[in-house]
Amino acid sequence: MTRQTILAGWLVVVSALLCASARPAQADEVKELRVCGDPNNLPFSNEKLEGIENKIADVIAKDLGMSVAYTWWPHQRGLVKRVLNTGRCDVMLGIPKGYDPVLWTKPYYRTGYVLAYRKDRGLKVRSLDDPQLKKLKIGVQVNTPPHDALGQRGIVGDNVVGYQLMFDSNFHAEDYPGKLVEDLIAGEVDVALVWGPIAGYFAKKKAAPLEMVLLEDRPESGNRFAFDISMGVRKGNKELKGKLEDALARKHDEIKHILEDFGVPLLPAAEEKARDKTAP
């Protein structure tokens, strides 16, 4: 047997062994669920993975046999165009159903804006039509449905204090989402009109005695206060959408537990309400 024949045979054996050892690694390779995350926006997400969306992303990824990989970007205008649509990430959490720039999943919870005040103030305000509101100092997130509704009712002026809903910690860090709730707890405002998950989280965090009234939709006046919340993927990515919806259905109870643990005020999904109305 020649030296060349021996070497050739040895190379064949080594190649076969390398290929055989490589196959299991490929089979066991964990794929990534690439999430568009806000780096500093509790209660929703942060880089320490402490938010609602961080926890839900972990649950969904685990169900799909994947690991979570984040692209951090403040959730402001331009997120879809600059980050999701350029392929830097594949899924956004916590978007309203019907948000047109993306392909959205079936919703995984429903919540809304709340009217909140301290229980020890002796107030009994149940709606935006209560005449007491014209005499109280109201904190409200600007350019939101409750803000518009106050204007429709002529509640404007010095007794209305505006707060930011959208937040970028790189600019105006003092306008963090919980500031309105913390000002309410401190007595800086009498009543707060605030997005429910923000109100519930910061009230629970501070162990504050707050009364929170979920605002009812008023279709006749164009006031919509409750929203179904979905995940969003790039338009056309029906495969990922389907996988996410399947995982959301399987993990419904676990996701609900996460939301309740964060103090999110929950409403029946729109589909459930429609079924209840048509039930015999």
PLM features per residue range, with description:
Residues 39-43, 47-62, 115, 119-175, ...:
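Bilobed "Venus flytrap"/periplasmic-binding protein-like clamshell domains
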Residues 66-67, 85-94, 135-137, 179-180, ...:
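Alpha-to-beta junction loops
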Residues 27-100, 170-174, 261-265:
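Extracytoplasmic small-molecule ligand-binding "clamshell" domains
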Residues 58, 62, 67-133, 143-144, ...:
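Acidic, polar ligand-binding/catalytic clefts
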Residues 38-41, 110-122, 146-151, 165-167, 204-266, ...:
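Periplasmic-binding protein-like
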Residues 20-27:
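Boundary at the C-terminal end of the N-terminal hydrophobic targeting segment
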Residues 8-20:
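Bacterial N-terminal signal peptides
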